[in-house]
Amino acid sequence: MSKLYEAVMGLVVADALGVPVEFEPRDSYQVTEMTGYGTYRQLPGTWSDDSSMTLATLESSKRKGCVDPADIMQNFFLWLYEKQFTARDDVFDVGNACRNAIWTYGQGVAPEDCGGTGERDNGNGALMRMLPLGLLLEGTDEAKAAAVRQIAGLTHNHMISHIGCLIYVFVAAELLRGSEKRTALSSALERAARIYGHEPAWQNYVRLPEIEALSREEIKSSGYVADTLEAALWCLLRTENYRDCALLAVNLGEDTDTVGAVAGGLAGLIYGLDGKTGIPAEWTEVIPRKEWIRELCEGVETIRC
């Protein structure tokens, strides 16, 4: 089983876990198993925009063999308007920044000019789809940072998002190399700081070195990119198996599916499928289009920046 498939399934499963309770206040519910319906009245196992945009990014990168922003944006267009890359031919839970950027692209605007550039354009809609870049990009850290800026900027073209996405990409890359998760975070922060540490926007991530020590009350699970990255890494560091990590994430409330997806991708990479610590088989059983996802993850090892 490829690490890419395990990581992608980790993201998809946790996304689906969070879909039924998205926007619910913290502690107003308790997810313990895969459920359905709820917020969007979807069947159990149905994944949302987090997975769709991740899979759209992966499909383009595999087919092209490199990071191609225009091709990835075209895949996003096919997802939003033609229901490709969806779980059950239904597009739902699309963030405003992503919807606006893809609509703008459809009006003939160049892909690099579609993403929001303001400080308020820092939702988690770029972060949630960065996993393939973390696992597949080859090149120098500077080249990887440039690629992440391009792909994040398709929908979220502000430095706060760029930094958060790069940290996540570096964490995933460190985990893929076999680093222990705390070491992976420390190394990722060092690598990202060499590129962006001088930027004022870096201050949005100063809690990350000590994130594990924070209490649940100090962790926010909003749709803001820095909150989502903090919450996902906190869940990863506070748990020792996939199930506990994913459930901790989706039970934080608010943006449950995206916090789950961001944490779940890393947890899937660490713990794999099945076994005592891996993604529970009863959760993957209800995920639609598993064979397509598996095929998408086969035969791709690296992509050029």
PLM features: residue spans?
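Structured, active/binding-site neighborhoods that engage oxygen-rich ligands
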Residues: 1-305
